[in-house]
């Protein structure tokens, strides 16, 4: 009999509820363990998901629980946040004064449960919170990572597909750096159907687009979504679900994520968005792209920005 795949979701707000639904509807989980401090909200989400299961193509068990119940999980997705803090601002750091104390509080509870799987963090500021979780959980390197620039890369893929008419599955690109305003697209590593962007641009005008404009669109995509509905849900939920699938199936697939750097790209002591090999042990390798000198300088600047923001941890 195949081993039952158990996934936990911590935080059942807009994002957490959509993560749970994505895991269920795609058949990624056999069992979902949902945790939230608001017991009535938790009960409501559990009931709603159970009501949906009968019409799903996969059998999924959904139950509410507390942090002690997370011990049985293969993967936990952390999505605790306070989205209302972002109203009137375009800076994910605004959430930091809420999310860091919250994470410090419940990370110890997750650790006390005996959890020994992989944790994927969504909570913002993603790179800083992911590092905080890794420090408190004490799991082996790679077993705690964040969605990071995974969602931003999806936005870039979408923009490139619309611009060129090439299906997004035939495009290779990454957003790197901070999951926030300090990120960039290394254009030298972008390819379509296996050929570099510059090769295409030399022969087809569709590929002679304004690269700065598309990068800006990718960075600002979340705020376009937020401005009309005051949350983001579908994109980040499917990003996290894709990463969970990669872990459960030991895919060894390259995906952009917030990973610990210990010398890669000449950086250390922080988490940042980089291409990673993701498998059963979480981030199993940080892929070092052959960046140009200009792109290397840009990445270092992004990392300096993350370090600067980490200084605020001393005040929390």
Where are these regions (language model features)?
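A structured beta-alpha segment of the ubiquitous adenosine-cofactor-binding alpha/beta core
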Residues: 53-75, 79-90, 98-114
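Conserved S-adenosyl-L-methionine
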Residues: 25-31, 138-141
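Glycine-rich Rossmann-fold phosphate-binding loop(s) that bind the pyrophosphate
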Residues: 12-13
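Conserved N-terminal Rossmann-fold NAD(P) cofactor-binding segment
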Residues: 37-74, 307-316
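Rossmann-like NAD(P)(H) cofactor-binding subdomain of soluble oxidoreductases
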Residues: 90-157
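C-terminal substrate-binding/catalytic lobe of Rossmann-fold NAD(P)-dependent dehydrogenases
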Residues: 136-143, 152-316
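Hydrophobic Val/Ile/Leu positions in short beta-strands of Rossmann-like dinucleotide-binding domains
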Residues: 8-9, 34
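N-terminal Rossmann-fold NAD(P) dinucleotide-binding loop
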Residues: 16-17
């Amino acid at each position: 009999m195949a081993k039952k795949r158990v996934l936990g979701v911590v935080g059942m707000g807009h994002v957490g509820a959509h993560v749970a639904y994505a895991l269920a509807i795609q058949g990624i989980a056999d069992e979902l363990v949902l945790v939230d401090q608001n017991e009535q909200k938790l009960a409501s989400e559990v009931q709603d998901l159970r009501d949906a299961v009968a019409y799903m193509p996969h059998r999924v068990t959904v139950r509410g629980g507390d942090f002690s119940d997370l011990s049985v999980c293969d993967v936990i997705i952390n999505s605790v946040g306070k989205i209302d803090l972002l109203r009137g601002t375009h800076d994910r750091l605004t959430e930091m004064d809420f999310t860091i104390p919250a994470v410090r509080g419940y990370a110890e509870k997750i650790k006390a449960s005996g959890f020994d799987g992989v944790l994927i963090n969504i909570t913002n500021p993603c790179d800083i919170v992911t590092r905080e979780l890794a420090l408190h959980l004490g799991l082996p390197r790679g077993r705690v990572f964040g969605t990071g620039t995974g969602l931003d890369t999806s936005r870039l893929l979408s923009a490139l597909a619309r611009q060129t008419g090439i299906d997004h599955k035939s495009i290779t690109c990454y957003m790197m750096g901070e999951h926030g305003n300090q990120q960039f697209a290394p254009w030298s590593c972008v390819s379509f159907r296996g050929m570099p962007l510059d090769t295409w641009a030399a022969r087809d005008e569709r590929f002679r687009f304004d690269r700065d404009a598309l990068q800006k669109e990718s960075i600002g995509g979340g705020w376009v979504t937020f401005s009309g509905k005051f949350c983001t849900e579908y994109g980040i939920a499917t990003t996290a679900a894709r990463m969970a699938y990669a872990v459960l199936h030991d895919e060894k697939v390259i995906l952009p994520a917030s990973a610990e750097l210990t010398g890669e790209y000449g950086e250390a002591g922080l988490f940042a968005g980089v291409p990673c090999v993701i498998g059963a042990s979480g981030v199993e390798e940080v892929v070092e792209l052959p960046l140009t000198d200009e792109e290397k300088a840009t990445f270092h600047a992004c990392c300096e920005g993350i370090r600067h923001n980490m200084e605020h941890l001393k005040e929390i």
